[in-house]
From Swiss-Prot:
Residue numbers spanned by region Disordered: 1-27
Signal peptide annotation: none
Compositionally biased spans, kind Polar residues: 9-27
SUPFAM superfamilies found in the cross-reference section: L28p-like
Protein name: Large ribosomal subunit protein bL28
Family (UniProt): Belongs to the bacterial ribosomal protein bL28 family.
Superkingdom, natural source: Bacteria
Gene behind the chain: rpmB
GO CC terms, sorted: ribonucleoprotein complex; ribosome
Organism per entry: Lactobacillus delbrueckii subsp. bulgaricus (strain ATCC 11842 / DSM 20081 / BCRC 10696 / JCM 1002 / NBRC 13953 / NCIMB 11778 / NCTC 12712 / WDCM 00102 / Lb 14)
GO biological process annotation, one example: translation
GO molecular function: structural constituent of ribosome
InterPro entries per record: Bacterial_rp_bL28, Ribosomal_bL28, Ribosomal_bL28/bL31-like_sf, Ribosomal_bL28_bact-type, Ribosomal_bL28_sf
Swiss-Prot/TrEMBL keywords: Ribonucleoprotein, Ribosomal protein
């Protein structure tokens, strides 16, 4: 799975618990979008989370 180019955010793993407290594995995936941003003055297509886009840490080209 891809990870956020700016923050390094990636899939995390844990357990979900039923009412009887039985455990099963599950994962939480970040909302990643492939966008073009400027990296070292050149446009590059990278994976960026929507939270990073909304916060203004990167700007699209």
């Amino acid at each position: 799975m891809a990870k956020d180019f700016v923050t390094g955010k990636k899939t995390t793993f844990g357990n979900t618990r039923s009412h009887a407290l039985n455990s099963s594995s599950r994962s939480w995936k970040p909302n990643l979008q492939k966008v073009r941003i400027l990296v070292n003055g050149k446009p590059k297509r990278v994976w960026v989370s929507t939270k990073t886009l909304k916060s203004g840490k990167v700007t699209r080209v």
